[in-house]
């Protein structure tokens, strides 16, 4: 096991000595004496700090400046990391009473008039307090940064996101889509404008559409064009309120009354027929003849189907009887071959060969 490296150095001077404040005398509580009862000799001046070059000369140092981006050293560098700890320290300093004595007083020290701590108290500090005073003094040096307004300390800067991008986007959108007042609506019961007056309206719409055109990249799909409203009146509406052939037909019949007797072409209205006329009688006779013919054809097809079924049934019975006859002959031949001896079978096979 290697021993830990300890370095001998003079006691660290208080922070107030670097800010041109009167040097503080070493507290007698650090040596186990009550306050105000120390030796009579004057306090020794603080020792001059040793040059930094003589500290840890035998240790190895690494230069990491090559690995750090120089652009990262700005006023906001590591500000977010120390924000929380400094806020806690400021909150503690603000919570302390205004005349609450000094940072080096122990909690049980009596308080005199005006909030000042009585030096030494009536009975002195508790035993053993002087042994821990040195470590306590070293650990309470941090609040001096807050008590003394040091000019070298920078104020805490909170990083905020830039908002110039939002303003630039708004300006760009305003340049792409300028406000265009809508054209005044036409008065009611107005006739459609003639052809020579409709051209400026169309040019205005084309110009308006050209101003609001979006510039897309080659990879994006092109949106469908916006339909331009026509200045001409809408077509006639049909029976259901929709434009269609029915509405146009009604308008045509209204303008030409002589078309009503003709049935209206493709309309669903039935034609009025006189049942006592010869034409109606001839038509009914032709229809009856066609119906009789279709019925006779259906009956004939039915009779033909029945005859075909009878023929197929008779053929099936005849084939079944033939199969039964052949099966009986086969059984008879098998019985004959079983009764013959094997020698005769061999001779018969030899004669056949």
Swiss-Prot record:
Required to induce adipocyte differentiation: annotated span: 126-200
Annotated DNA-binding residue span(s): 280-295
Location of region: Leucine-zipper: 312-340
Region feature Interaction with FOXO1, mapped onto this chain: 240-353
Pfam family, one: bZIP_2
Keywords: Acetylation, Activator, Developmental protein, DNA-binding, Isopeptide bond, Nucleus, Phosphoprotein, Transcription, Transcription regulation, Ubl conjugation
GO molecular function: DNA binding; DNA-binding transcription activator activity, RNA polymerase II-specific; DNA-binding transcription factor activity, RNA polymerase II-specific; protein homodimerization activity; RNA polymerase II cis-regulatory region sequence-specific DNA binding; transcription cis-regulatory region binding
SMART domains for the chain: BRLZ
Cross-link named Glycyl lysine isopeptide (Lys-Gly) (interchain with G-Cter in SUMO), sites: 159
Region (Basic motif): 281-308
Residues that bear N6-acetyllysine: 159
Location of the region described as Required for interaction with TRIB1 in the Swiss-Prot/TrEMBL record: 54-72
S-S pairs: none
Pro residues bias locations: 40-49, 179-195, 220-234
Biological process terms in GO annotation: DNA-templated transcription; fat cell differentiation; glucose homeostasis; granulocyte differentiation; lipid homeostasis; liver development; lung development; myeloid cell differentiation
Positions of the UniProt region annotated as Disordered: 1-56, 176-197, 213-278
Positions bearing the Glycyl lysine isopeptide (Lys-Gly) (interchain with G-Cter in SUMO2) cross-link: 159
Domain remark text: The recognition sequence (54-72) is required for interaction with TRIB1.
Complex and partners: Binds DNA as a homodimer and as a heterodimer. Can form stable heterodimers with CEBPB, CEBPD, CEBPE and CEBPG. Interacts with PRDM16. Interacts with UBN1. Interacts with ZNF638; this interaction increases transcriptional activation. Interacts with the complex TFDP2:E2F1; the interaction prevents CEBPA binding to target gene promoters and represses its transcriptional activity. Interacts with RB1. Interacts (when phosphorylated at Ser-190) with CDK2, CDK4, E2F4 and SMARCA2. Interacts with SREBPF1.
Chain's role: Transcription factor that coordinates proliferation arrest and the differentiation of myeloid progenitors, adipocytes, hepatocytes, and cells of the lung and the placenta. Binds directly to the consensus DNA sequence 5'-T[TG]NNGNAA[TG]-3' acting as an activator on distinct target genes. During early embryogenesis, plays essential and redundant functions with CEBPB. Essential for the transition from common myeloid progenitors (CMP) to granulocyte/monocyte progenitors (GMP). Critical for the proper development of the liver and the lung.
Protein name as annotated: CCAAT/enhancer-binding protein alpha
Organism expressing this protein natively: Bos taurus (Bovine)
Lineage: Eukaryota, Metazoa, Chordata, Craniata, Vertebrata
Gene from which the chain derives: CEBPA
